[in-house]
Amino acid sequence: MAPQLLLCLIQTFLWSLPEAESNVFLKSNVANRFLQRTKRANSGFEEIYPANFERECVEERCSKEEAREVFEDDEKTEAFWTVYVDGDQCLSNPCHYGGTCKDGIGSYTCTCLAGYEGKNCEHDLLKSCRVDNGNCWHFCKPVQNDTQCSCAEGYRLGDNGFSCIAEGEFSCGRNIKSRNKREASLPDFQTDFSDDYDAIDENNLIETVQSQSATLLKKSDNPNPDIRIVNGLDCKLGECPWQAVLIDEKGTAFGGGTILSPYFVLTAAHCINKTKSIAVVVGQVDISRKETRRLLSVDKVYTHPKYVHVTNDYDIAIIQLKTPIQFSENVVPACLPTADFANHVLMKQDFGIVSGFGRIEEKGPTSNILKVVMVPYVDRHTCILSTKIPITRNMFCAGYGNQPEDACEGDSGGPHITAYKDTHFLTGIVSWGEGCGRDGKYGIYTKVSNFLPWIKTIMRRKQPSTESSTGRL
């Protein structure tokens, strides 16, 4: 009985299917009244028709070449393609200070307004150390999107955040006397010396440190290291207060130096090997007046360990005195710059100042009067082309090339000073040259900024030793 009942149910279900289909599915002619499928444009022969943006890049994923066919313009194609591929990178307005954004694939480019730079035009050049030294009088340091000023030793930062105020009466780099008030006389301490000065004679002058290249001193074909002011002006008392003079065992001036601190004088390494003994004189503008000068005895001499006599590379040495220099309005140390300040600010100035008691012309007599001359900086390429002698990274050129104004014999070791905001910084040491003031030739100077760590390491030894000695570091 049960099998017959199941069979009847199946048969009844099968009979009802056609009627169910007619109730659920519409006939095609009726269905097309309500449901329509949008067909692609120009289907069938689309390649023979003009490019169509909708067909090429909306309905389908187009290639860059297909987009080029649509726009028929490279610039418009690039503008579309960079957005089409990965979206518009400029939607977030990444360019600051009114910069214009141009989208790229996976990147963007900002075109900055004048006075701004950086990937997002985020750097205000008015707040950059590269523009007018960030308005800093001395040293400038970039800090995030701003600048931070600081000052040389002996100065404090002004309330305005960029000026430098001298803390002491004889802070470094100051010309205390105005030129019109200077007198051609020796400073007071020269005629009435303190007991702190150690007056010495040739019997107690120390022997200087011998160079490791001393055997090369007999060579005569190297550039003139001693020959280094031609056609300079008289340096009035107090105008070159950082000038030091090196005196040999005969009491003759043979080179120059720069006062760095009460105990230290900077000079050229090649000067150290020119005499058996040396002493130092400061505050003097007329070396013929021997009766009024006092010699400062030397405690140690530090010649740079890499100094090469033949090439005059690393031509730098430091003299440490036994007793401190007494500063006055006529005796003031030069300021030491930072390397960045020297390289990017000071040495970008037009002129440096060179002083000394050297020959007043090539092969001429030396000068008893301190001379000073302003010499322009020379770009490195011109400097290198001016001579067959190697110009190393530790050297730079200064001079006119077509005017006979130069350092000359007897000026060696003396200061090359650059003034900035009324402060005078040491930028070079008179080193060597081919003759004096020759046409097409320049004076060569030791680049002090390369040696600041070495200088400061030695100057930390402020206290002189109890016994005279020589040394190398």
UniProtKB/Swiss-Prot annotation:
Active site: 270 (charge relay system), 315 (charge relay system), 412 (charge relay system)
Reaction catalyzed: Selective cleavage of Arg-|-Thr and then Arg-|-Ile bonds in prothrombin to form thrombin
InterPro entries: Coagulation_fac-like_Gla_dom, EGF-like_Ca-bd_dom, EGF-like_dom, EGF-type_Asp/Asn_hydroxyl_site, EGF_Ca-bd_CS, GLA-like_dom_SF, GLA_domain, Pept_S1A_FX
Residues bearing glycans: 92, 273
Keywords on record: Blood coagulation cascade activating toxin, Calcium, Cleavage on pair of basic residues, Disulfide bond, EGF-like domain, Gamma-carboxyglutamic acid, Glycoprotein, Hemostasis impairing toxin, Hydrolase, Protease, Prothrombin activator, Repeat, Secreted, Serine protease, Signal, Toxin
Tissue specificity: Expressed by the venom gland.
Residue span(s) of the pro-peptide: 21-40, 182-228
Peptidase S1 domain residues: 229-460
Compartments, as annotated in UniProt: Secreted
GO molecular function: calcium ion binding; peptidase activator activity; serine-type endopeptidase activity; toxin activity
Post-translational modification 4-carboxyglutamate, affected residues: 46-47, 54, 56, 59-60, 65-66, 69, 72, 75
Post-translational changes noted in the entry: The vitamin K-dependent, enzymatic carboxylation of some glutamate residues allows the modified protein to bind calcium.
Signal peptide: 1-20
EC code(s) of this entry: 3.4.21.6
GO biological process: blood coagulation; induction of blood coagulation in another organism; proteolysis; venom-mediated blood coagulation
Additional record remark: Is classified in the group D of snake venom prothrombin activators, since it requires the mammalian factor Va for maximal activity for the cleavage of prothrombin.
Record family assignment: Belongs to the peptidase S1 family. Snake venom subfamily.
Binding partners and assembly: Heterodimer of a light chain and a heavy chain; disulfide-linked.
Its biological purpose: Snake prothrombin activator that attacks the hemostatic system of prey. This protein is functionally similar to blood coagulation factor Xa.
Protein name: Venom prothrombin activator vestarin-D1
